[in-house]
Curated annotation (Swiss-Prot):
This is AP-2 complex subunit beta. Belongs to the adaptor complexes large subunit family. The gene is apl1. Its main location: membrane. Gene3D superfamilies: Leucine-rich Repeat Variant. Residues 636-654 have a biased composition (Polar residues).
């Protein structure tokens, strides 16, 4: 370390000695060598800021290589020594008027890269002039400089009209200038909440023409920007999609995915259902090609994007399921994504191929893969009603292996199956009895407790089994305590005489002895509901819920649309719209047009209807509000002293049930599911 320190110390000394030379032209090569060593020292973490005055004085040289090194040094240390850096502004402005286009471009790039007010204020006038420079390289640098200035001071750029200049540059004769102007414009759009961008057909055609003359990075920028083109007439979207199609075969994954995004975006403006499906299917081969690459990271990204696309076209891979079979050398995160996709594309026709795969995966060594496979089998039983018996038989077969984590995951999915098909598979309950001792995870125990409460009237030992779980009530996690409380109340509503002592103890524990506010509040709510009106309590606690549904649609249409417009971005990996994890990000949506295609909730391209997601969200909230109002009625209007409360109207349940209470609660109901899981 000491030898290295002395080396960079000597470099600084050499540089100072070179600058003190009277003949600057003869010492140019030495200064270049010394500056390279100084910048190398900076990369190793050494402080070279003491050379700042000497470097600034060297900027007057006409040597291009020396200027590049001086400008690089300036960009590194300008923020460290802003006062001294201001001296360099005049020298940079002199270079902007140089006859050499490389020097003009280099000077402007430096002036817009330093986040010091004197620098970017000084850049405002030159950048307007250089936007019309005769050299395309200088114009390209000026376009990128506008985006940099916008990141420093948005109001200054917006008021100066530079953004309008940037839009005009989309008609530049140079494809490189057009692509870089577009990249700068997109950068501004993505960092602004009030800036709206749309492209005319003429501009969009020019952008497509420039694709062939651009680098891969600029091709990606152009393809990302083409979603701001809004077709206005029938046939425009199809014609435009055909022009983009050749880039589906591009070797660069980012370019290929950019083309996929544009084509799928254009399907929103196609009226013919068959053409829509045709273009969805046209994107399948490039996706499969990318999926076949050896890079696991690339595979993961493609799989995450395919999941989003399947929201719009579930049948896209229905006949090509083998692409998503797990390979022995796939990392676990790739295998899990493949299982999700297989579950999505499964139907009555391909289940004979998918179900054996899941059963095989459930016999693997990897515990996470086994759990996911068992869960997927349960989802298939819910999704494909015609073949539910085959899926349930596979679950029973797996439970017979007596592998603990298999049993626990199977119990969880059996709960969902019972909710989906109430009254159809009660024969599964005895199988659960045989494996109760194997359940030690909270989710599995909660599932069994839910079943005991939901089917208490059909399970003879339900009270005994619940009492066994109640012995360790205070040692259980909150999730199980809440489930136990709800299950005990449901058992009491169905078997009031036998469960009276049990419900008394549990409500007393929850209202008097526990510290968790959620558990205590729920106990108080149940106590008030039972004391106010037992019959209404039945209607709330034993109310029917919407049946469990495991379909293709994971998201509402608005979210799906936003994800489709953000394919091949970080949003497609998170499966969240950008505005949910990036502050100030714009919400993407399809612009209105006479040919805009309207979708239904299932987002299937073969169906059309109006976008009613907001209305459906309101209806869903309205349903919950009705339940909330019923509970408020108990809390505010129907609270009267009863055997369930003491004379001071306390919030605790402290008394025994008399015969009248038991008689009132003696008629059990048989609901499809319960309310407060």
């Amino acid at each position: 370390m000491s030898s290295s320190s002395s080396h960079f110390s000597s470099t600084a000394a050499d540089l100072l000695a070179v600058f003190s030379s009277d003949n600057k032209d003869k010492s140019a090569n030495k200064r270049i060598s010394a500056l390279k060593k100084a910048i190398a020292g900076i990369s190793y973490g050494y402080d070279m800021s003491s050379l700042f005055p000497s470097v600034i004085s060297s900027m007057e040289s006409n040597n291009l290589e020396l200027k590049k090194l001086c400008y690089l040094y300036l960009k590194i240390y300008a923020s460290v020594k802003p006062t001294e850096a201001k001296r360099a502004v005049k020298l940079i402005l002199n270079d902007i008027y140089s006859s050499n286009p490389m020097i003009r471009s280099l000077a402007l790039r430096t002036l817009t890269s330093v986040n010091i007010k004197n620098f970017w204020v000084a850049a405002m006038d030159p950048i307007v002039r250089l936007l019309d420079d005769t050299d395309p390289y200088v114009r390209k640098t000026a376009a990128i400089g506008i985006a940099k200035l916008y990141s420093y001071d948005k109001k200054m750029v917006e008021s100066s009209g530079l953004i309008d200049h940037l839009k005009e540059m989309l008609s530049d004769e140079s494809s490189v200038v057009v692509a870089n102007s577009l990249a700068a414009l997109m950068n501004i759009v993505n960092s602004s909440t009030g800036f709206k961008l749309t492209f005319s057909r003429e501009i969009s055609n020019k952008l497509v023409k420039s694709l062939t003359d651009c680098s891969e990075w600029l091709q990606v920028a152009i393809l990302d920007a083409l979603i701001f083109y809004v077709p206005q007439k029938p046939g425009e979207a199809e014609s435009f999609a055909e022009r983009i199609s050749p880039w589906l075969q591009h070797g660069n994954a980012a370019v290929c995915m950019g083309a996929v995004k544009v084509i799928l975006y254009l399907t929103n403006y196609m009226k013919d259902d068959n053409r829509v499906k045709e273009y969805f299917m046209k994107t399948q081969p490039p996706l499969v090609t990318l999926l076949a690459r050896k890079s696991s990271a690339t595979q993961y990204v493609i799989l995450r994007n395919i999941q989003i696309i399947l929201e719009q076209c579930p049948e896209m891979f229905a006949n090509d399921i083998h692409f998503f079979y797990c390979n022995f050398d796939d990392p676990i995160y790739v295998k899990l994504e493949k299982l999700d996709i297989l579950t999505k594309i499964a139907d009555i026709h391909n289940l004979d191929q998918i179900l054996p795969e899941f059963v095989e995966y459930a016999s693997e060594i990897d515990v996470e893969l086994v759990r996911k496979s068992v869960k997927c089998i349960g989802y298939l039983a819910i999704k494909i009603e015609e073949r539910k018996n085959d899926c349930i038989d596979s679950l029973i077969e797996l439970m017979n292996t007596k592998v603990t984590y298999v049993i626990q995951e199977a119990v969880i999915v059996i709960r969902d199956i019972l909710r989906k098909y109430p009254g159809s598979y009660k024969s599964l309950v005895p199988i659960l009895y045989e494996n109760l001792d194997s359940l030690d995870e909270p989710d599995a125990k909660s599932a069994v407790i839910w079943i005991l409460g939901q089917y208490a009237e059909e399970i003879e030992d339900s009270i005994t089994l619940l009492n066994d779980y109640l012995k360790g009530f205070f040692d259980e996690p909150l999730e199980i305590q809440l489930t136990l409380l709800t299950a005990v109340i449901k058992v009491f509503l169905k078997k009031p005489t036998a469960a009276a002592d049990m419900v008394t103890n549990v409500l007393q524990w929850c209202t008097d002895e526990v510290n968790d506010p959620d558990l205590r509040d729920r106990g108080i709510i149940y106590s008030r509901m039972l004391s106010a009106n037992p019959e209404l309590a039945k209607k709330v606690i034993l109310a029917n819920m919407p049946p469990v549904n495991v379909g293709t649609g994971m998201y509402d249409p608005d979210t799906t649309e936003q994800l489709m417009l953000n394919i091949s971005t970080l949003s497609s990996i998170y499966h969240k719209p950008p505005n949910r994890f990036v502050k100030g990000a714009q919400v993407a949506y399809c612009e209105p047009s006479p040919v805009l295609r309207l979708r239904t909730r299932d987002s299937n391209p073969s169906n059309t209807d109006s976008r009613e997601s907001n209305h459906k969200k309101y209806n869903h909230f309205h349903q919950k509000s009705q339940t909330r109002r019923v509970m408020e009625q108990y809390d505010r209007n129907s609270w009267n002293p009863s055997p369930f409360s003491d004379e001071s109207n306390s919030n605790t349940f402290s008394g025994k049930f008399d015969s009248a209470d038991q008689e009132n609660l003696g008629m059990p109901m048989t609901p499809e599911t319960h309310l407060m899981d």
